[in-house]
Amino acid sequence: MGVTVLQPYPLEKSGAQTIDFLLKRVVALGAVPAGQFLVDCETYSSNPQLGPPKTVHILHNSEQPASVFSILDTGTKQIPLVTDGLFDLLMTRIAPAYTSKKQTKIESKGQRFEFGDFVIKLGSVTMSQNFKGVLVEVEYRPCLVPGSCWELMREFLQGFLGSNVSNSMPAYFTQRSSINPNHSKANEIYQPIDTINQYLEHFTNYRKQTMAPVGVRP
């Protein structure tokens, strides 16, 4: 895999109309349909009787179907873990310690396109079957270090998303590296967990939206 950037797209029409608008733009570029994709997230909260509150986010990405991504949030730091599918079973077995917040299960799914070295995904974000927004994912496959290809990716994103895309690199990549505090994530080799972390960041923002603006519906 290469480097991936997520970009929320503002809604001026319904969700379906927005996706259709973006789909036409992507097809006009010459991108070729390449199946469907799905990224989902379910969140578990620890039993308050067992000590300080902790949260576990369990995510799946159709690009890595054999992997389960989990992120433990202690309140002061996040600890990522990548495992196989048995981890889902484990979470059901420790129900007394961690309880799923079913009403906040959230996912982004939609069509996947390929355009040369780029992969484009147009995602409709829903939480408990309620439409929350549109999230565009773009991957540039030949690149391994975000800082080396951001300018190219920015130009590509702005080419079909317009001025909604900032000239500045997304805040996720400007964070200090956990491996080398002297570097930012922009200078590290990109990993699948980086895509998951970006999705969790955006999913968290969507969850904070108690209701969609008037007139914005799927």
From Swiss-Prot:
GO terms for biological process: regulation of transcription by RNA polymerase II. Keywords: Activator, Nucleus, Transcription, Transcription regulation. Its main location: nucleus. One of its GO terms (molecular function) is transcription coactivator activity. GO terms for cellular component: mediator complex. It is found in: Nucleus. InterPro entries: Mediator_Med20 (IPR013921). Component of the Mediator complex, a coactivator involved in the regulated transcription of nearly all RNA polymerase II-dependent genes. Mediator functions as a bridge to convey information from gene-specific regulatory proteins to the basal RNA polymerase II transcription machinery. Mediator is recruited to promoters by direct interactions with regulatory proteins and serves as a scaffold for the assembly of a functional preinitiation complex with RNA polymerase II and the general transcription factors. Component of the Mediator complex. Belongs to the Mediator complex subunit 20 family. This is Mediator of RNA polymerase II transcription subunit 20. It comes from Anopheles gambiae (African malaria mosquito).
